[in-house]
Curated annotation (Swiss-Prot):
Organism annotation: Thermodesulfovibrio yellowstonii (strain ATCC 51303 / DSM 11347 / YP87)
Record-listed E.C. numbers: 2.4.1.227
Family: Belongs to the glycosyltransferase 28 family. MurG subfamily.
PANTHER family: GLYCOSYLTRANSFERASE, UDP-N-ACETYLGLUCOSAMINE--N-ACETYLMURAMYL-(PENTAPEPTIDE) PYROPHOSPHORYL-UNDECAPRENOL N-ACETYLGLUCOSAMINE TRANSFERASE 1
An example Gene Ontology CC term for this record: plasma membrane
Metabolic or biological pathway: Cell wall biogenesis; peptidoglycan biosynthesis
InterPro entries: GlcNAc_MurG, Glyco_trans_28_C, GlycoTrans_28_N
Keywords: Cell cycle, Cell division, Cell inner membrane, Cell membrane, Cell shape, Cell wall biogenesis/degradation, Glycosyltransferase, Membrane, Peptidoglycan synthesis, Transferase
Annotated signal peptide: none
Residues reported in the UniProt entry to bind UDP-N-acetyl-alpha-D-glucosamine: T10, G11, G12, N124, R165, S195, I250, Q295
Protein name: UDP-N-acetylglucosamine--N-acetylmuramyl-(pentapeptide) pyrophosphoryl-undecaprenol N-acetylglucosamine transferase
GO BP, one annotated term: carbohydrate metabolic process
Length: 366
């Protein structure tokens, strides 16, 4: 099987694509997979480390640009269509997946024009511009939330969930305890702000420590700060003698998840998919500038099921965050109910479901 996975730009688009590739290789070890993205997208840094082949196209973003920038974007679209056609002619894929982001658009369109089966993945409640357009021509659409079906043709839309890395389900607690200096018997709080950290979350958590002093001997914290905030966040924990492992970046996220009892995080599609696949209680703080406000929508979906607590970014401060933490940790039944609701919401085998759809399309083509 020869497969192109197109799109990326951000982790929310890219990581489900990598997870899908992992599922494909698991079922078809001989599969040949190439990713197509842009030199400025996250894929340029991440894909080379995975061992997959990566090709670039010249497409530029369109949404939120000035008139002159939109003119440049349209010009880049024409060039990227030519580049996409060349990639497809050279590689001759059996199927093309679009994982979202503007880089997916010309590749999926070029595949459609060549009558190659295409599947687009929509990880959020409201599709972005690329997927709204591609949904009209794609062979199939894989969605994460039932509400999203209103944006696509029901006949070819499937509720699959967002693919996650299988490693997420296989965390090694014993390894994690050594890695993060975990003390048995304490409640572990994992704090994430995305791969670059999030200053607003860092500030709220450190300001909230004074409100969490009564819990100091019951909790321990793993905090990913981002490079810029590492030193001062580390010092805040040390000054108040909280048991905390503070890191600029967590490379062993699988192990961090395995020992976490409560996760404080943004609400990107990949993060939500991972948290629910492993049934973690969480406090979600949606990134307020995400396209179409999709992070808040993701978080509200979980909130409606009792799977998380929600704090809007504009309302976030130390006292508010500490109140949410106290509410959950002082009533063990609340955390247990959140864990069960989270697990019920999760779809850990989304990748396999999407592969089944691909197999069906390929059988029909024959």
């Amino acid at each position: 099987m020869r497969v192109i996975i197109a799109g990326g730009g951000t982790g929310g688009h890219l990581f489900p694509g990598i997870a899908l590739a992992e599922s494909l290789i698991g079922k078809y070890p001989e599969a040949q997979i190439i990713f197509v993205g842009t030199p400025k997208g996250l894929e340029a840094k991440v894909i080379p480390k995975t061992g997959y082949e990566l090709s670039f196209i010249s497409i530029q973003g369109f949404v939120g640009k000035s008139f002159s920038e939109k003119a440049k974007s349209l010009k880049s679209l024409l060039k990227s269509m030519f580049e996409s056609k060349n990639i497809i002619n050279s590689f001759a894929p059996d199927i093309v997946f679009g994982v979202g982001g503007y880089a997916s658009f010309p590749v999926v369109l070029a595949a459609f024009l060549k009558k190659i089966p295409t599947i687009i993945l929509e990880q959020n409640t409201v599709p972005g511009l690329a997927n709204k357009l591609l949904g009209k021509i794609a062979s199939a659409v894989a969605i994460t939330y039932p509400e999203t079906i209103e944006y696509f043709s029901r006949e070819k839309t499937y509720l699959t969930g967002t693919p996650i890395r299988k490693k997420i389900l296989e965390g090694n607690k014993e390894k994690a305890k050594k890695l993060f200096d975990i003390e048995e018997g304490r409640i572990t709080i994992l704090i994430l702000g995305g791969s670059l950290g999030a200053r607003k979350i860092n500030k709220a958590m450190t300001e909230g420590l004074s409100y969490l002093l009564p819990l100091k001997n019951r909790i321990q914290i793993i905090h990913q700060t981002g490079e810029a905030d590492y030193n001062w966040v580390y010092n805040e924990y040390r000054n108040l003698s909280f048991r905390a492992t503070v890191l600029p970046f967590i490379y062993d996220m699988v192990e961090a998840y395995s020992v976490a009892d409560l996760v404080i995080s943004r609400a990107g599609a990949s993060t939500v998919a991972e948290l629910t696949a492993i049934g973690k209680a969480s406090i979600l703080i949606p990134y307020p500038y995400a396209a179409y406000n999709h992070q808040e929508m993701n978080a509200r979906r979980l909130l409606s099921r009792g799977a998380c607590e929600l704090i809007l970014d504009r309302e976030l401060n130390g006292e508010v965050l500490a109140k949410k933490i106290n509410k959950i940790l002082n009533k063990p039944e609340i955390m247990k109910e959140m864990e069960m609701a989270s697990l019920a919401f999760g779809k850990p085998y989304a990748g396999e479901k999407i592969i089944e759809i691909a197999e069906s399309l390929l059988r029909r083509k024959r």
